[in-house]
Amino acid sequence: MTDPTNAPALDENQIIAERRAKLAAIREAGVAFPNDFERRDYAGRLAHEHGDKSKEALEAEAVDVQLAGRMMLKRVMGKASFATLQDMSGRIQVYVSNDLTGLDAHEAFKRWDLGDFVGVSGTLFKTNKGELTIQAKSVRLLSKALRPLPEKFHGLADQEQKYRQRYLDLITNDDARSTFVRRSKIIQAIREFMTGHGFLEVETPMMHPIPGGAAAKPFVTHHNALDMELFLRIAPELYLKRLVVGGFEKVFEINRNFRNEGLSTRHNPEFTMMEFYEAYREYRYLMDFTEALIRHTAVAATGSTTISYQGSTIELGTPFDRLTIVEAVRKYHPEYTVEQLNDRDWLTAQFTAMKAKYREHDGLGGLQLTFFEETTEALLVQPTFIVDYPAEVSPLARRSDTQPEITERFELFITGREMANGFSELNDAEDQAERFMEQVRAKEAGDEEAMHYDADFIRALEHGLPPTGGCGIGIDRLVMLLTDSPSIRDVILFPQMRREA
Protein backbone atom coordinates (compact mmCIF):
# COMPACT_ATOMS: atom_id res chain seq x y z
CA MET A 1 0.00 0.00 0.00
CA THR A 2 1.34 3.41 -0.92
CA ASP A 3 0.41 6.98 -0.17
CA PRO A 4 -1.55 8.17 -3.20
CA THR A 5 -1.29 11.89 -2.49
CA ASN A 6 -0.18 13.64 -5.67
CA ALA A 7 -0.57 17.20 -4.40
CA PRO A 8 2.46 19.50 -4.59
CA ALA A 9 4.77 19.28 -1.60
CA LEU A 10 3.91 21.75 1.12
CA ASP A 11 6.34 23.86 3.07
CA GLU A 12 7.00 22.17 6.42
CA ASN A 13 5.96 25.28 8.32
CA GLN A 14 2.65 25.25 6.47
CA ILE A 15 2.14 21.57 7.30
CA ILE A 16 2.86 22.23 10.98
CA ALA A 17 0.44 25.17 10.97
CA GLU A 18 -2.31 23.01 9.47
CA ARG A 19 -1.70 20.28 12.03
CA ARG A 20 -1.80 22.78 14.88
CA ALA A 21 -5.15 23.97 13.59
CA LYS A 22 -6.42 20.38 13.59
CA LEU A 23 -5.15 19.91 17.14
CA ALA A 24 -6.92 23.09 18.24
CA ALA A 25 -10.19 21.71 16.85
CA ILE A 26 -9.62 18.41 18.64
CA ARG A 27 -8.98 20.24 21.92
CA GLU A 28 -12.18 22.19 21.41
CA ALA A 29 -14.13 18.96 20.94
CA GLY A 30 -12.82 17.20 24.05
CA VAL A 31 -9.74 15.40 25.37
CA ALA A 32 -6.96 15.82 22.82
CA PHE A 33 -4.49 13.34 24.31
CA PRO A 34 -6.47 10.50 25.95
CA ASN A 35 -4.65 7.90 28.02
CA ASP A 36 -7.41 5.40 28.72
CA PHE A 37 -6.97 3.19 25.64
CA GLU A 38 -6.04 -0.34 26.69
CA ARG A 39 -3.74 -2.05 24.20
CA ARG A 40 -4.03 -5.83 24.24
CA ASP A 41 -2.32 -6.84 21.02
CA TYR A 42 0.86 -6.23 19.03
CA ALA A 43 1.31 -6.26 15.27
CA GLY A 44 4.21 -8.69 15.31
CA ARG A 45 2.47 -11.18 17.56
CA LEU A 46 -0.71 -11.07 15.47
CA ALA A 47 1.33 -11.75 12.33
CA HIS A 48 3.12 -14.63 14.05
CA GLU A 49 -0.06 -16.22 15.40
CA HIS A 50 -2.45 -15.59 12.51
CA GLY A 51 -0.39 -14.65 9.45
CA ASP A 52 -0.42 -18.16 7.95
CA LYS A 53 -4.12 -18.79 8.46
CA SER A 54 -6.46 -18.84 5.50
CA LYS A 55 -9.06 -16.20 4.83
CA GLU A 56 -11.78 -18.69 5.68
CA ALA A 57 -10.17 -19.79 8.94
CA LEU A 58 -9.85 -16.19 10.15
CA GLU A 59 -13.45 -15.48 9.25
CA ALA A 60 -14.57 -18.52 11.22
CA GLU A 61 -12.48 -17.61 14.27
CA ALA A 62 -13.54 -13.94 14.33
CA VAL A 63 -10.44 -12.93 16.32
CA ASP A 64 -11.08 -9.73 18.29
CA VAL A 65 -8.06 -7.43 18.64
CA GLN A 66 -7.26 -4.10 20.27
CA LEU A 67 -4.07 -2.49 19.00
CA ALA A 68 -2.40 0.91 18.90
CA GLY A 69 0.40 2.33 16.82
CA ARG A 70 1.75 5.17 14.70
CA MET A 71 0.01 5.66 11.36
CA MET A 72 2.62 5.23 8.64
CA LEU A 73 0.44 4.95 5.53
CA LYS A 74 -3.12 5.94 4.67
CA ARG A 75 -5.30 5.50 1.60
CA VAL A 76 -8.79 7.02 1.49
CA MET A 77 -11.32 5.62 -1.01
CA GLY A 78 -14.64 7.30 -0.34
CA LYS A 79 -16.67 5.05 1.93
CA ALA A 80 -13.63 3.05 3.08
CA SER A 81 -9.99 3.67 3.95
CA PHE A 82 -6.88 1.61 4.57
CA ALA A 83 -4.06 2.53 6.93
CA THR A 84 -0.89 0.91 8.22
CA LEU A 85 -0.12 1.13 11.93
CA GLN A 86 3.36 0.53 13.30
CA ASP A 87 4.21 -0.52 16.85
CA MET A 88 7.42 -1.78 18.40
CA SER A 89 6.88 -5.30 17.04
CA GLY A 90 5.97 -4.53 13.43
CA ARG A 91 3.23 -3.23 11.14
CA ILE A 92 -0.35 -4.21 10.39
CA GLN A 93 -3.00 -2.95 8.00
CA VAL A 94 -6.29 -1.48 9.23
CA TYR A 95 -9.56 -1.21 7.28
CA VAL A 96 -11.89 1.64 8.26
CA SER A 97 -15.35 1.95 6.68
CA ASN A 98 -18.58 3.89 6.97
CA ASP A 99 -20.54 0.67 7.42
CA LEU A 100 -18.65 -0.98 10.28
CA THR A 101 -16.70 1.85 11.89
CA GLY A 102 -19.39 4.47 11.50
CA LEU A 103 -19.67 7.56 9.31
CA ASP A 104 -18.58 10.08 11.96
CA ALA A 105 -15.59 8.00 13.06
CA HIS A 106 -14.51 7.45 9.46
CA GLU A 107 -14.81 11.14 8.63
CA ALA A 108 -12.66 11.98 11.67
CA PHE A 109 -10.15 9.32 10.63
CA LYS A 110 -9.81 10.91 7.19
CA ARG A 111 -8.58 14.12 8.85
CA TRP A 112 -5.83 12.37 10.80
CA ASP A 113 -2.28 12.60 9.52
CA LEU A 114 0.63 10.27 8.99
CA GLY A 115 2.62 10.09 12.20
CA ASP A 116 -0.46 10.27 14.43
CA PHE A 117 -0.96 7.57 17.05
CA VAL A 118 -4.19 5.64 16.58
CA GLY A 119 -5.99 3.04 18.69
CA VAL A 120 -8.17 0.50 16.89
CA SER A 121 -10.56 -2.24 17.99
CA GLY A 122 -11.90 -4.82 15.57
CA THR A 123 -11.55 -8.29 14.09
CA LEU A 124 -8.89 -9.88 11.95
CA PHE A 125 -9.47 -10.78 8.32
CA LYS A 126 -7.48 -11.22 5.15
CA THR A 127 -7.89 -9.11 2.04
CA ASN A 128 -8.26 -10.66 -1.40
CA LYS A 129 -4.50 -10.19 -1.77
CA GLY A 130 -3.94 -12.19 1.42
CA GLU A 131 -2.81 -9.34 3.68
CA LEU A 132 -3.62 -9.69 7.37
CA THR A 133 -5.84 -6.74 8.28
CA ILE A 134 -7.86 -5.41 11.20
CA GLN A 135 -11.45 -4.61 10.28
CA ALA A 136 -12.01 -1.64 12.56
CA LYS A 137 -15.12 -1.42 14.69
CA SER A 138 -13.79 1.70 16.39
CA VAL A 139 -10.81 4.02 15.93
CA ARG A 140 -9.45 6.70 18.28
CA LEU A 141 -6.84 9.38 17.89
CA LEU A 142 -4.48 8.91 20.83
CA SER A 143 -1.74 11.45 20.08
CA LYS A 144 -1.48 14.12 17.40
CA ALA A 145 1.85 14.54 15.57
CA LEU A 146 2.52 18.17 14.73
CA ARG A 147 5.53 17.56 12.50
CA PRO A 148 5.44 15.41 9.35
CA LEU A 149 7.42 12.23 8.88
CA PRO A 150 10.40 12.33 6.49
CA GLU A 151 9.21 12.57 2.89
CA LYS A 152 8.08 9.29 1.30
CA PHE A 153 8.73 7.49 4.59
CA HIS A 154 11.87 5.94 3.14
CA GLY A 155 13.90 7.20 6.07
CA LEU A 156 16.33 10.05 6.42
CA ALA A 157 18.64 10.55 3.47
CA ASP A 158 21.15 12.65 5.43
CA GLN A 159 23.39 10.45 7.56
CA GLU A 160 24.10 13.17 10.11
CA GLN A 161 20.39 13.85 10.52
CA LYS A 162 19.90 10.16 11.34
CA TYR A 163 22.25 10.53 14.28
CA ARG A 164 20.88 13.88 15.46
CA GLN A 165 17.24 12.84 15.15
CA ARG A 166 17.50 9.15 15.95
CA TYR A 167 13.81 9.03 16.81
CA LEU A 168 12.95 9.71 13.15
CA ASP A 169 15.47 7.12 12.01
CA LEU A 170 13.85 4.54 14.29
CA ILE A 171 10.36 5.43 13.06
CA THR A 172 11.21 5.08 9.38
CA ASN A 173 14.13 2.65 9.21
CA ASP A 174 13.54 -1.04 9.92
CA ASP A 175 17.28 -1.74 9.80
CA ALA A 176 18.01 0.85 12.48
CA ARG A 177 15.39 -0.64 14.79
CA SER A 178 16.78 -4.12 14.13
CA THR A 179 20.30 -2.98 15.02
CA PHE A 180 19.29 -1.69 18.43
CA VAL A 181 17.10 -4.70 19.18
CA ARG A 182 20.12 -6.87 18.41
CA ARG A 183 22.31 -4.66 20.59
CA SER A 184 19.98 -5.38 23.50
CA LYS A 185 20.20 -9.11 22.78
CA ILE A 186 23.99 -8.93 22.68
CA ILE A 187 24.20 -7.28 26.09
CA GLN A 188 21.65 -9.74 27.48
CA ALA A 189 23.71 -12.66 26.12
CA ILE A 190 26.87 -11.28 27.74
CA ARG A 191 25.10 -10.96 31.09
CA GLU A 192 23.75 -14.50 30.83
CA PHE A 193 27.21 -15.85 30.02
CA MET A 194 28.88 -14.02 32.87
CA THR A 195 26.30 -14.85 35.53
CA GLY A 196 26.20 -18.42 34.23
CA HIS A 197 29.91 -18.65 35.03
CA GLY A 198 29.41 -17.43 38.57
CA PHE A 199 30.29 -13.75 38.14
CA LEU A 200 28.67 -11.05 40.25
CA GLU A 201 27.52 -7.93 38.41
CA VAL A 202 28.53 -4.75 40.23
CA GLU A 203 28.43 -0.98 39.79
CA THR A 204 31.42 1.22 40.53
CA PRO A 205 31.74 5.03 40.60
CA MET A 206 31.31 7.13 37.46
CA MET A 207 33.07 10.13 39.04
CA HIS A 208 36.64 9.58 40.21
CA PRO A 209 38.89 11.79 42.33
CA ILE A 210 41.84 10.52 40.28
CA PRO A 211 41.48 9.38 36.64
CA GLY A 212 42.90 5.90 36.19
CA GLY A 213 42.61 2.46 34.69
CA ALA A 214 43.54 3.47 31.13
CA ALA A 215 45.73 5.82 29.14
CA ALA A 216 43.27 8.52 28.08
CA LYS A 217 42.29 12.15 28.60
CA PRO A 218 39.42 12.53 31.09
CA PHE A 219 36.46 14.87 31.24
CA VAL A 220 36.74 17.16 34.26
CA THR A 221 33.89 18.36 36.45
CA HIS A 222 33.53 20.09 39.82
CA HIS A 223 31.57 19.05 42.90
CA ASN A 224 30.24 22.28 44.37
CA ALA A 225 29.35 21.04 47.87
CA LEU A 226 32.70 19.31 48.35
CA ASP A 227 34.60 21.96 46.39
CA MET A 228 36.67 19.32 44.65
CA GLU A 229 37.63 18.43 41.12
CA LEU A 230 36.29 15.12 39.82
CA PHE A 231 36.81 13.17 36.61
CA LEU A 232 34.30 11.16 34.62
CA ARG A 233 35.69 7.68 34.61
CA ILE A 234 37.89 6.54 31.76
CA ALA A 235 37.81 2.94 33.04
CA PRO A 236 36.42 1.06 36.08
CA GLU A 237 39.50 -1.15 36.46
CA LEU A 238 40.99 0.13 39.70
CA TYR A 239 37.66 0.00 41.53
CA LEU A 240 36.89 -3.50 40.28
CA LYS A 241 40.28 -4.69 41.52
CA ARG A 242 39.54 -3.11 44.89
CA LEU A 243 36.49 -5.40 45.00
CA VAL A 244 38.68 -8.44 44.38
CA VAL A 245 40.86 -7.27 47.27
CA GLY A 246 37.64 -7.13 49.30
CA GLY A 247 36.81 -10.76 48.55
CA PHE A 248 34.51 -10.56 45.51
CA GLU A 249 36.56 -13.01 43.48
CA LYS A 250 34.51 -12.94 40.24
CA VAL A 251 33.03 -9.57 39.26
CA PHE A 252 31.95 -7.82 36.09
CA GLU A 253 30.48 -4.46 35.13
CA ILE A 254 28.73 -3.25 31.97
CA ASN A 255 28.68 0.51 31.97
CA ARG A 256 29.78 3.74 30.33
CA ASN A 257 33.28 5.14 30.09
CA PHE A 258 34.14 8.69 29.04
CA ARG A 259 37.27 9.80 27.20
CA ASN A 260 37.88 13.39 26.17
CA GLU A 261 39.23 12.53 22.75
CA GLY A 262 38.33 12.77 19.07
CA LEU A 263 35.39 11.40 17.12
CA SER A 264 35.74 8.75 14.42
CA THR A 265 33.98 5.70 13.02
CA ARG A 266 35.56 3.75 15.91
CA HIS A 267 35.48 6.32 18.70
CA ASN A 268 32.74 8.09 20.64
CA PRO A 269 33.68 10.02 23.80
CA GLU A 270 30.92 8.19 25.71
CA PHE A 271 31.00 4.44 25.13
CA THR A 272 30.06 1.13 26.74
CA MET A 273 32.53 -1.39 28.13
CA MET A 274 32.27 -4.71 29.91
CA GLU A 275 35.12 -5.42 32.31
CA PHE A 276 35.50 -8.60 34.33
CA TYR A 277 37.98 -9.83 36.93
CA GLU A 278 38.52 -13.29 38.34
CA ALA A 279 40.87 -14.33 41.12
CA TYR A 280 43.32 -17.19 40.52
CA ARG A 281 43.29 -16.82 36.74
CA GLU A 282 45.98 -15.66 34.32
CA TYR A 283 45.98 -14.21 30.83
CA ARG A 284 46.03 -17.47 28.86
CA TYR A 285 42.80 -18.56 30.58
CA LEU A 286 41.33 -15.10 29.93
CA MET A 287 41.95 -15.50 26.21
CA ASP A 288 40.09 -18.83 26.20
CA PHE A 289 37.26 -17.31 28.23
CA THR A 290 36.99 -14.21 26.02
CA GLU A 291 36.94 -16.38 22.90
CA ALA A 292 34.10 -18.49 24.34
CA LEU A 293 32.18 -15.37 25.40
CA ILE A 294 32.35 -13.84 21.93
CA ARG A 295 31.25 -17.11 20.30
CA HIS A 296 28.32 -17.40 22.69
CA THR A 297 27.30 -13.81 22.00
CA ALA A 298 27.58 -14.21 18.23
CA VAL A 299 25.31 -17.26 18.26
CA ALA A 300 22.79 -15.49 20.50
CA ALA A 301 22.74 -12.43 18.23
CA THR A 302 23.04 -13.97 14.76
CA GLY A 303 22.52 -17.72 15.14
CA SER A 304 26.00 -18.50 13.82
CA THR A 305 29.71 -18.18 14.52
CA THR A 306 30.32 -17.30 10.87
CA ILE A 307 29.35 -13.71 10.19
CA SER A 308 29.65 -11.22 7.37
CA TYR A 309 31.14 -7.82 8.06
CA GLN A 310 31.36 -5.19 5.32
CA GLY A 311 31.97 -7.81 2.65
CA SER A 312 34.37 -9.97 4.67
CA THR A 313 33.49 -13.34 6.15
CA ILE A 314 34.59 -13.50 9.79
CA GLU A 315 35.02 -16.93 11.36
CA LEU A 316 34.47 -16.88 15.11
CA GLY A 317 34.03 -20.64 15.45
CA THR A 318 37.67 -21.68 15.01
CA PRO A 319 40.50 -20.99 17.50
CA PHE A 320 41.64 -17.39 17.38
CA ASP A 321 45.21 -16.77 16.24
CA ARG A 322 47.75 -15.79 18.93
CA LEU A 323 50.81 -13.78 17.94
CA THR A 324 53.35 -11.48 19.54
CA ILE A 325 53.76 -7.98 18.14
CA VAL A 326 56.85 -8.96 16.15
CA GLU A 327 55.24 -12.21 14.94
CA ALA A 328 52.19 -10.32 13.70
CA VAL A 329 54.28 -7.77 11.79
CA ARG A 330 56.35 -10.56 10.26
CA LYS A 331 53.24 -12.56 9.29
CA TYR A 332 51.76 -9.69 7.29
CA HIS A 333 55.05 -8.05 6.27
CA PRO A 334 57.62 -10.83 5.78
CA GLU A 335 59.96 -8.30 4.16
CA TYR A 336 60.81 -6.98 7.64
CA THR A 337 63.42 -9.00 9.51
CA VAL A 338 63.45 -9.76 13.22
CA GLU A 339 66.75 -7.87 13.44
CA GLN A 340 65.20 -4.76 11.93
CA LEU A 341 62.18 -4.91 14.22
CA ASN A 342 64.52 -5.10 17.22
CA ASP A 343 66.57 -2.10 16.06
CA ARG A 344 65.43 1.18 17.63
CA ASP A 345 67.20 3.34 15.07
CA TRP A 346 65.68 1.40 12.16
CA LEU A 347 62.19 1.80 13.63
CA THR A 348 62.53 5.56 14.14
CA ALA A 349 63.84 5.91 10.58
CA GLN A 350 60.73 4.08 9.33
CA PHE A 351 58.48 6.43 11.26
CA THR A 352 60.24 9.41 9.71
CA ALA A 353 59.85 7.93 6.22
CA MET A 354 56.14 7.19 6.68
CA LYS A 355 55.56 10.52 8.49
CA ALA A 356 54.10 8.68 11.46
CA LYS A 357 53.97 10.12 14.96
CA TYR A 358 55.86 8.36 17.72
CA ARG A 359 57.02 9.19 21.23
CA GLU A 360 60.74 9.83 21.27
CA HIS A 361 61.06 8.76 24.91
CA ASP A 362 59.63 5.29 24.16
CA GLY A 363 61.84 2.26 24.56
CA LEU A 364 62.11 -0.53 22.01
CA GLY A 365 58.85 -2.14 23.08
CA GLY A 366 56.88 1.08 22.72
CA LEU A 367 58.35 1.71 19.28
CA GLN A 368 57.55 -1.84 18.17
CA LEU A 369 53.96 -1.34 19.28
CA THR A 370 53.69 1.92 17.33
CA PHE A 371 55.15 0.23 14.24
CA PHE A 372 52.61 -2.60 14.60
CA GLU A 373 49.78 -0.07 14.90
CA GLU A 374 50.95 1.79 11.79
CA THR A 375 51.61 -1.23 9.56
CA THR A 376 49.69 -4.27 10.74
CA GLU A 377 46.76 -3.62 13.07
CA ALA A 378 44.30 -2.82 10.26
CA LEU A 379 45.16 -6.13 8.55
CA LEU A 380 43.96 -8.27 11.47
CA VAL A 381 40.56 -9.01 9.95
CA GLN A 382 40.17 -12.50 11.39
CA PRO A 383 40.14 -12.81 15.21
CA THR A 384 43.70 -12.45 16.49
CA PHE A 385 45.12 -12.11 19.98
CA ILE A 386 48.27 -9.99 20.12
CA VAL A 387 50.14 -11.12 23.23
CA ASP A 388 53.06 -10.20 25.50
CA TYR A 389 52.83 -6.41 25.39
CA PRO A 390 55.82 -4.31 26.52
CA ALA A 391 55.87 -3.45 30.22
CA GLU A 392 56.47 0.23 29.41
CA VAL A 393 53.01 0.54 27.83
CA SER A 394 51.24 -1.77 30.30
CA PRO A 395 51.47 -0.10 33.73
CA LEU A 396 48.76 -2.26 35.34
CA ALA A 397 49.78 -5.65 33.94
CA ARG A 398 51.93 -8.35 35.57
CA ARG A 399 55.44 -8.78 34.20
CA SER A 400 56.53 -12.05 32.64
CA ASP A 401 58.55 -14.16 35.09
CA THR A 402 61.12 -15.00 32.40
CA GLN A 403 61.13 -11.76 30.36
CA PRO A 404 60.52 -8.80 32.69
CA GLU A 405 60.48 -6.35 29.77
CA ILE A 406 57.13 -7.79 28.63
CA THR A 407 53.84 -8.42 30.42
CA GLU A 408 51.21 -11.14 30.50
CA ARG A 409 48.87 -9.02 28.41
CA PHE A 410 46.82 -9.47 25.26
CA GLU A 411 44.61 -7.44 22.97
CA LEU A 412 42.02 -9.01 20.69
CA PHE A 413 41.61 -7.63 17.17
CA ILE A 414 38.79 -8.40 14.73
CA THR A 415 38.19 -6.52 11.45
CA GLY A 416 41.31 -4.50 12.20
CA ARG A 417 39.84 -3.09 15.41
CA GLU A 418 40.73 -3.67 19.03
CA MET A 419 37.86 -5.56 20.65
CA ALA A 420 39.32 -6.54 24.02
CA ASN A 421 42.27 -5.85 26.30
CA GLY A 422 43.20 -8.19 29.13
CA PHE A 423 46.06 -9.30 31.32
CA SER A 424 47.25 -11.02 34.41
CA GLU A 425 46.86 -8.24 36.95
CA LEU A 426 49.83 -6.66 38.66
CA ASN A 427 49.33 -7.51 42.35
CA ASP A 428 52.77 -6.51 43.65
CA ALA A 429 52.07 -3.22 45.46
CA GLU A 430 55.70 -2.07 45.33
CA ASP A 431 56.02 -2.80 41.61
CA GLN A 432 52.71 -1.01 40.97
CA ALA A 433 53.89 2.03 42.93
CA GLU A 434 57.03 2.21 40.82
CA ARG A 435 55.01 1.83 37.60
CA PHE A 436 52.79 4.70 38.70
CA MET A 437 55.91 6.81 39.33
CA GLU A 438 57.10 6.00 35.79
CA GLN A 439 53.73 7.22 34.52
CA VAL A 440 54.07 10.41 36.56
CA ARG A 441 57.48 11.04 35.04
CA ALA A 442 56.05 10.43 31.56
CA LYS A 443 53.23 12.89 32.25
CA GLU A 444 55.75 15.49 33.43
CA ALA A 445 57.64 14.91 30.19
CA GLY A 446 54.54 15.80 28.17
CA ASP A 447 52.55 12.56 27.84
CA GLU A 448 49.00 13.80 28.49
CA GLU A 449 47.57 10.26 28.54
CA ALA A 450 49.97 8.90 31.15
CA MET A 451 48.34 7.79 34.41
CA HIS A 452 48.28 9.56 37.75
CA TYR A 453 49.66 8.11 40.97
CA ASP A 454 46.72 6.56 42.86
CA ALA A 455 47.78 6.26 46.50
CA ASP A 456 44.47 4.75 47.63
CA PHE A 457 44.76 1.98 45.05
CA ILE A 458 48.30 1.24 46.25
CA ARG A 459 46.95 1.08 49.80
CA ALA A 460 44.35 -1.46 48.64
CA LEU A 461 47.05 -3.57 46.97
CA GLU A 462 49.07 -3.47 50.18
CA HIS A 463 46.19 -5.35 51.84
CA GLY A 464 46.77 -8.11 49.29
CA LEU A 465 45.32 -8.84 45.85
CA PRO A 466 45.23 -12.56 44.97
CA PRO A 467 46.56 -13.67 41.58
CA THR A 468 43.92 -12.19 39.27
CA GLY A 469 43.09 -11.89 35.61
CA GLY A 470 41.01 -9.09 34.11
CA CYS A 471 39.70 -8.10 30.70
CA GLY A 472 37.74 -5.27 29.11
CA ILE A 473 35.57 -5.73 26.01
CA GLY A 474 34.27 -2.85 23.90
CA ILE A 475 30.53 -3.43 23.67
CA ASP A 476 29.96 -0.86 20.91
CA ARG A 477 32.61 -2.36 18.65
CA LEU A 478 31.31 -5.86 19.31
CA VAL A 479 27.82 -4.67 18.35
CA MET A 480 29.27 -3.12 15.18
CA LEU A 481 30.75 -6.50 14.30
CA LEU A 482 27.57 -8.48 14.98
CA THR A 483 25.25 -6.02 13.18
CA ASP A 484 27.51 -5.35 10.17
CA SER A 485 27.63 -1.65 11.04
CA PRO A 486 30.47 0.45 9.55
CA SER A 487 30.43 3.21 12.18
CA ILE A 488 30.19 3.28 15.96
CA ARG A 489 27.52 5.97 15.53
CA ASP A 490 25.29 3.35 13.92
CA VAL A 491 25.16 1.33 17.15
CA ILE A 492 24.89 4.13 19.73
CA LEU A 493 21.36 5.49 19.97
CA PHE A 494 22.42 9.09 20.53
CA PRO A 495 26.09 9.50 19.53
CA GLN A 496 28.05 12.63 20.30
CA MET A 497 27.79 15.17 17.48
CA ARG A 498 29.45 18.46 16.69
CA ARG A 499 27.39 21.59 17.18
CA GLU A 500 24.88 22.23 14.43
CA ALA A 501 25.89 25.09 12.16
Swiss-Prot record:
UniProt: Mg(2+) 1 binding residues: 411, 418
EC number: 6.1.1.6
GO CC annotation terms, alphabetical: cytosol
Cofactor: Mg(2+)
Catalytic function, reaction form: tRNA(Lys) + L-lysine + ATP = L-lysyl-tRNA(Lys) + AMP + diphosphate
Residues bound to Mg(2+) 2: 418
One GO-annotated biological process of the protein: lysyl-tRNA aminoacylation
Pfam families: tRNA-synt_2, tRNA_anti-codon
Coiled-coil blocks: none
Cofactor remark from the record: Binds 3 Mg(2+) ions per subunit.
GO molecular function: ATP binding; lysine-tRNA ligase activity; magnesium ion binding; tRNA binding
Keyword annotations of the record: Aminoacyl-tRNA synthetase, ATP-binding, Cytoplasm, Ligase, Magnesium, Metal-binding, Nucleotide-binding, Protein biosynthesis
CDD domains tied to this protein: LysRS_core, LysRS_N
Cell location: Cytoplasm
Annotated InterPro entries: Aa-tRNA-synt_II, aa-tRNA-synth_II, aa-tRNA-synth_II/BPL/LPL, Lys-tRNA-ligase_II, Lys-tRNA-ligase_II_N, Lys-tRNA-synth_II_C, NA-bd_OB-fold, NA-bd_OB_tRNA
Record text on subunit structure and interactions: Homodimer.
Family note: Belongs to the class-II aminoacyl-tRNA synthetase family.
Protein name: Lysine--tRNA ligase
Organism whose genome encodes this protein: Thiobacillus denitrificans (strain ATCC 25259 / T1)
Gene: lysS
